Design a protein with these regions (language model features):
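Flexible, acidic loop-helix segments that line cofactor/substrate-binding pockets
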Residues: 2-18
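Flexible, glycine-rich terminal cap/loop adjacent to redox cofactors
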Residues: 14-117
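Rossmann-like dinucleotide/flavin-binding elements
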Residues: 1-7, 68, 109
């Protein structure tokens, strides 16, 4: 089974803090003519980040305002390398924000930040 290598969808930079990103960014979405909504949540409000003593950073998603489809996401902070994969799936499968909001995240986990978006 052959697949094409799609470099733009490699979602992680292993750094400190960790960075995860997928899909399109705000600027690119606007350049492409999308009417967008930007939703952002901070790790300062994340219980797992508080427990681990590393509550800096945020998660952000870019949503098409007309269709509700998730166009992109950026996560900077603890757990970003693991959390971003959920967003890669959402972007690749063109999941709508209302569908995404129905996903349950265990408590306390870093991925709970996505429930706040």
């Amino acid at each position: 089974h052959r697949t094409e290598f799609d470099q733009p969808e490699i979602p992680v930079v292993f750094s400190n803090p960790a960075i995860g990103s997928c899909g399109i960014k705000e600027k690119e979405a606007k350049e492409k003519g999308f009417d967008i909504e930007v939703k952002k949540a901070f790790f300062k409000a994340n219980p797992k980040a508080k427990i681990e003593g590393d509550d800096s950073g945020f998660a952000k998603i870019i949503v098409c305002a007309n269709s509700g489809v998730i166009l992109g996401s950026s996560i900077i902070g603890a757990g970003a390398a693991e959390i971003i994969h959920e967003m890669v799936l959402a972007v690749e499968k063109k999941i709508k924000i209302e569908e995404f909001k129905g996903i349950i995240h265990a408590h306390p986990t870093f991925s709970e930040i996505l429930s706040s978006l």
